Amino acid sequence: MKVLVSACIMGTNCKYNGKNNKNLAAVNFLKDKEVILICPELLAGMEIPRPCAEIVNGSVVDENGKNVDLAYRKAVSLALSKIQNEEIDLAILQSRSPTCGVNQIYDGSFTGKLTAGTGLFAKALKQRGYKVVDVEEIGNCFMEASI
């Protein structure tokens, strides 16, 4: 099984704050899988660390009020290009991110409040027919049976 995975989940320090979201449940799940690490922001050459960004009225804006939507959309395009010739069975993406969030994203108020929504890369993958799951679903018992 070939699995596309947000690089931060596997311990790559590529989050906006220079840290990672290493998830041991995901690491264990992926032990016997072929893994393709992806970080759209890293592919696009975004700085690490960089200002926090959220989706505000459909556009990505950073915490300083700067519209960074074009940079994030470029990042998604680069990530899609990187995987275009891959036969990916599953994508496991980081929760809440304006790029990779699957079920929820931050609401754009920069207060930590969540709302139902999908990040730009997760949305693009779903639109192209990929099976996309939130990393937080990895611990659910039903997941392995459904893959």
Give the role of each language-model region.
Residues 11-18:
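Short N-terminal binding/cap micro-motifs at the start of the first secondary-structure element
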Residues 22-35, 75-90:
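Short amphipathic alpha-helices and their capping/turn segments at secondary-structure boundaries
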Residues 21-62:
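Short, surface-exposed acidic-centric catalytic microdomains
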Residues 11, 45, 98-101:
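Short, active-site-adjacent cap segments at secondary-structure transitions
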Residues 79-109:
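N-terminal glycine-rich phosphate/adenylate-binding segment common to multiple enzyme folds
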Residues 43, 52-55, 59-82, 113-147:
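Divalent-metal-activated hydrolytic enzyme cores
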Residues 8, 94-97, 137:
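Short, well-ordered beta-to-alpha junction loops that form the rim of enzyme active sites
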Residues 1-4:
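Extreme N-terminal starter segment of soluble prokaryotic enzymes
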